[in-house]
């Protein structure tokens, strides 16, 4: 019994499906959002400190 190109079609379909699943983010969404929020808060804190230092006339940051 011959399957024709069904095997090749299935391989291509499975490859496409596996690539799509790799793009999907793994893990608990709540924990991921909290971690991302903490990173953004740290970045914002650093930016605020840099702006305050520039306003005071000091230049600790990049020129």
Curated annotation (Swiss-Prot):
Paired cysteines (S-S): none
Domain of life: Eukaryota
GO cellular component: cytosol; nucleolus; nucleus
Keywords of this entry: Cytoplasm, Nucleus
Pfam families: SERF-like_N (PF04419)
Chain positions covered by the region annotation Disordered: 1-63
Main location: cytoplasm
UniProt key word Nucleus: yes
Subcellular location(s) of the protein: Cytoplasm; Nucleus, Nucleolus
Sequence ranges of Basic residues compositional bias: 14-24
Record InterPro entries: SERF-like_N
Family statement drawn from the similarity comment of this UniProt entry: Belongs to the SERF family.
Protein name in the entry: SERF-like protein C1705.02
Organism this protein belongs to: Schizosaccharomyces pombe (strain 972 / ATCC 24843) (Fission yeast)
Lineage of the species this protein comes from: Eukaryota, Fungi, Dikarya, Ascomycota, Taphrinomycotina
């Amino acid at each position: 019994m011959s399957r024709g190109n069904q095997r090749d079609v299935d391989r291509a379909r499975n490859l496409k499906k596996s690539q799509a699943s790799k793009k999907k983010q793994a893990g608990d969404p709540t924990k991921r959002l909290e971690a991302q929020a903490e990173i953004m808060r740290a970045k914002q804190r650093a930016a605020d400190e840099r702006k305050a230092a520039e306003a005071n006339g000091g230049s600790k940051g990049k020129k």
